[in-house]
């Protein structure tokens, strides 16, 4: 490699990197791989990307840098051959409710332009097409009437308005007109015209009366101009003994007078007041009090606490109880009946009140007795009013617990106002276009029939829309709709959307750094993704991809393996070169799995489903097609299927949310389904995802697993601590007493530098040890509390071998492959895969009831094949305890080791939503319709 076609890294020491030197080719597809926690991300993101970004930032003026987040220089001696860097990772999905697939990919911006330039407006009331016509066009149209036709030119000054309208008649008289037509009847303006005040009327001024013959063109033009001036552009031509013609010089319905402003792109923007629905301000939904959250358990009676809303609990003698008793008397129900037995009218009045109807309230004897009549506001209505009126954030937060998102009643979730939604291209409005899947949208755009003028205007716009839709298709996202909210996308989907957007921008000479773009992608769509990565490379860019997927590794021009282990045992370059060389590398675990020397074994026998099943009936959330699904309990089940087939809708939206509401009493609203049976065999549901175990530097594996409490208890039992009277709280860095107060137990102090990045320096008082001197003097087996937290988990296992309480928790962490992390390592430095395994370890350490269902969504994210092997062992262990494990997964190694599979499909989006196959992996592999089965066959 010549010097200018490579990136040379010298002395990289960020995180666990061990002063490594590395040379990689530019304009190539480079894959970085290695065990979870080996240092791949530290090299790719925290070193190469961070430095590329920092150098670009430093080329800007100090004034501009003030407004940008400052970048720290990574711990590296030098990097040569670096380009401006763009990182496409998992984490930066927009949580803005206004962000959609259309806005993120910029397709929506081009759509707004297209609808503004070639859209056809319609009347929002009657739906008829509205045309904008000049005076000359109107005159030419009228001149087409047959010779000798009698007609009059009318100016519609009042259309369907109540009133006597004497002002309008007076103004017409003063302007010199002599006739009007009111409600279809002709009147002379010299006579007195009386109209009913409370009826709607339509009034037209007769501007001129004409007979069609040669030479009337100039008089007709003048009359039409006069009529247009009086009405803002509306003109009626009343043909005697014929039909009436309506014309408009602006975008207005001649029938209803509803006018639409000139079409502009801002009119179709739901982030702009000109286009957004006035009710929901363009979000498409609003927060409303949800009766199902006020009374979540219809099996309870009101006396036993069916009503959960604060202030409305049925405690004898409260005003709430008096209202409920009055309603019970009115509707003939008892407060000891289950709510499910109450009539709809009764429940409706409990929620939304009596609408002004008075009910008899009886005051209890202990409150003085007596009775009075009053109306009742209703619990839901009361909460809505209090929510709207209160200024207290606490009150709003409390009431929000009983609210859920509901479709906006004005725009029905379409986000735009009526005028914008009445403009069409090819017979569809902009939101109907956005509701189509990418494939349908592409077919629609390709099939548009335009006039030569429209085709000329829209040529460039359509080219951009087609290419961007094509890129979304090429990264396997053809099932998404442009209206889909960006916040509902999975990490892999949002990353591939940004990948498609980058291809659309056609930059060259850029360094792209990607974090596992294959996440959430079925094997079937992998080839599309690889072709997309190559396309980005062929534009003249360098791609560094952190990836564990075998297909992507084999497609790389260059591969870098970081290892050999994880954490303190990693941080070295094991191999750097072409893929063929990695297969022969004896030191590389990756190479051994790639070449087939190491394999994850297929289990010799699988667990059989018992007679305990979870039956989901009529699941219809998102794209699910009213399906029935049976999930066996007590075994390890995997839900598979292509991206967008409905796996997450079934597992996360319906099964998890229903069970967490029922078993854990959480306030969530599950997706749409008819019924679910079998939950009586379960006592709790646990979702184990890759979200951080804590969001502050103070949370760590020790605090999450609870082992820190045991360690603090142990230190407080030492003779030294007892002599000084120290309790367990003395050894906490979160509360005053034992911690160093100079840094408040953080061990580091932040110094703001304004134009330069903030600098974090070790605390001068405690030297980064977090505790004060007296606390650090207390030792157990020669180590103080800071030194214990600074040990790796494996060191801790040896150190605490004779303290079962601590040993067991640390041993489980070691068993899940986390022996290398420090006991007190800050949770903000842990990867998603590490956080997930800490959660699994915490579960394994608990005493099992055998009635828990564990739900995991793509747990292999960020995991090397060797880590996947450990993960499978943990899942099998959890299942051995009699628990149920339900996993959504694309990784074939996990799929082949499951006891039972539920394969969704056949396609994504509108082409999915059904169960294609279910049974053991062998049974699914034998199914000719299943895509998953076809790939499984090769492994079994």
Regions of interest found by a model, annotated:
Residues 1-940:
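Conserved phosphate-binding elements of NTP-dependent enzyme cores
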């Amino acid at each position: 490699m010549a010097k200018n076609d490579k990136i040379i890294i010298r002395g990289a020491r960020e995180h666990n990197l061990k002063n490594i030197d590395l040379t990689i080719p530019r304009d190539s597809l480079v894959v970085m791989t290695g065990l979870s926690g080996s240092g791949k991300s530290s090299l790719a993101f925290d070193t190469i990307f961070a430095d590329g970004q920092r150098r670009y930032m430093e080329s800007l003026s100090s004034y501009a840098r003030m407004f940008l987040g400052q970048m720290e220089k990574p711990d590296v001696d030098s990097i040569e051959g670096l380009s401006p860097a763009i990182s496409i990772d998992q984490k930066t999905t927009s949580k803005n409710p206004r962000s959609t697939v259309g806005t993120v990919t910029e397709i929506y911006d081009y759509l707004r332009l297209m609808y503004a330039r070639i859209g056809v407006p319609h009347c929002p009331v009657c739906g008829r097409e509205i045309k904008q016509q000049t005076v000359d066009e109107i005159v030419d149209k009228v001149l087409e009437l047959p010779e000798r036709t009698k007609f009059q030119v009318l100016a519609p000054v009042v259309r369907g308005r109540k009133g006597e309208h004497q002002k309008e008649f007076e103004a017409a008289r003063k302007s010199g007109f002599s006739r009007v037509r009111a409600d279809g009847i002709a009147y002379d303006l010299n006579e007195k015209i009386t109209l009913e005040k409370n009826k709607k009327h339509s009034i037209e001024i007769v501007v001129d009366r004409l007979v069609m013959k040669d030479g009337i063109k100039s008089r007709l033009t003048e009359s039409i101009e006069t009529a247009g001036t009086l009405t803002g552009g509306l003109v009626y031509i009343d043909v005697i003994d014929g039909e009436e013609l309506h014309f408009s010089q602006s975008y207005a319905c001649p029938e209803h007078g509803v006018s639409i402003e000139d079409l502009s792109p801002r009119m179709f923007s739901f982030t702009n007041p000109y286009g957004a629905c006035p009710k929901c301000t363009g979000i498409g939904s609003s927060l409303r009090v949800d009766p199902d959250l006020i009374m979540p358990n219809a099996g309870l009676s009101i006396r036993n606490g069916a009503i959960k809303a604060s202030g409305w609990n049925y405690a004898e003698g409260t005003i709430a109880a008096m209202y409920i008793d009055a309603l019970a008397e009115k509707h003939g129900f008892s407060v000891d009946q289950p709510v499910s037995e109450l009539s709809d009218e009764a429940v409706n009045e409990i929620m939304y009140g009596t609408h002004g109807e008075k009910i008899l309230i009886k005051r209890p004897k202990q409150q003085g007795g007596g009775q009075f009549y009053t109306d009742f506001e209703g619990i839901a209505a009361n909460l809505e009013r209090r929510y709207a009126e209160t200024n207290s954030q606490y009150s709003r937060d409390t009431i929000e617990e009983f609210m859920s998102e509901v479709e906006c009643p004005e725009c029905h979730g379409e986000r735009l106002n009526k005028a914008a939604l009445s403009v069409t291209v090819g017979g569809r409005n902009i939101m109907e276009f956005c509701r189509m899947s990418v494939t349908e949208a592409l077919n629609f755009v390709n099939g548009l029939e335009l006039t030569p003028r429209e085709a000329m205007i829209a040529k460039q716009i359509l080219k951009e829309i087609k290419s961007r839709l094509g890129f979304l298709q090429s990264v396997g996202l053809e099932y998404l709709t442009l209206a889909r909210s960006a916040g509902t996308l999975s990490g892999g989907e949002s990353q591939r959307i940004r990948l498609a957007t980058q291809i659309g921008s056609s930059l060259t000479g850029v360094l792209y750094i990607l974090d596992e773009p294959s996440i959430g992608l079925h094997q079937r769509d992998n080839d599309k993704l690889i072709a997309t990565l190559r396309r980005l490379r062929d534009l003249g860019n360098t791609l560094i991809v952190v990836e564990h997927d075998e297909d992507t590794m084999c497609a790389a021009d260059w591969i870098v393996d970081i290892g050999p282990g994880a954490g303190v045992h990693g941080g070295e370059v094991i191999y750097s070169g072409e893929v063929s060389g990695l297969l022969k590398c004896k030191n590389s675990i990756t190479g051994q799995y790639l070449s087939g020397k190491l394999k994850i074994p297929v289990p010799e026998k699988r667990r059989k489903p018992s007679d305990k099943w979870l039956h989901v009936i009529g699941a219809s959330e998102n794209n699910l097609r009213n399906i029935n699904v049976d999930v066996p309990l007590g075994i390890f089940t995997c839900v598979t299927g292509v991206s967008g087939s409905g796996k997450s809708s079934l597992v996360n939206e319906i099964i998890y949310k229903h069970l967490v509401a029922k078993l854990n009493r959480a306030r969530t609203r599950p997706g749409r389904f008819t019924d679910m049976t079998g939950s009586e065999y379960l006592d709790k549901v646990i979702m184990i995802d890759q979200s951080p175990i804590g969001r502050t530097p103070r949370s760590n594996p020790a605090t999450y697993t609870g082992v820190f409490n045991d360690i603090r208890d142990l230190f407080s039992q030492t003779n030294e601590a007892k002599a000084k009277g120290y309790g367990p709280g003395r050894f906490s860095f979160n509360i005053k007493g034992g911690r160093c107060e100079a840094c408040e137990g953080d061990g580091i102090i932040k110094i703001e530098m304004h134009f330069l990045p903030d600098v974090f320096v070790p605390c001068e008082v405690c030297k980064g040890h977090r505790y004060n001197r007296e606390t650090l003097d207390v030792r157990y087996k020669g180590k103080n509390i800071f030194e214990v937290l600074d040990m790796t988990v494996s060191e801790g296992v040896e150190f605490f071998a004779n303290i079962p309480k601590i040993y067991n928790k640390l041993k489980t962490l070691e068993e899940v492959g986390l022996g290398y992390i420090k006991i007190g390592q800050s949770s903000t430095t842990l990867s998603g895969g590490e956080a997930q395994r800490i959660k699994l370890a915490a579960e394994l350490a608990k005493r099992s009831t055998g009635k828990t269902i564990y739900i995991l969504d793509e747990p292999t994210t960020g995991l090397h094949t060797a880590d996947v092997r450990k993960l499978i062992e943990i899942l099998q262990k959890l299942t051995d305890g009699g628990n149920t494990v339900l996993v959504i997964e694309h990784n074939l190694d996990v799929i082949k080791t499951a006891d039972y599979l539920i394969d969704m499909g056949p396609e994504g989006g509108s082409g999915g939503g059904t169960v294609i196959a279910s049974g053991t992996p062998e049974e699914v592999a034998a199914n000719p319709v299943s895509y998953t089965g076809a790939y499984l066959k090769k492994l079994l």
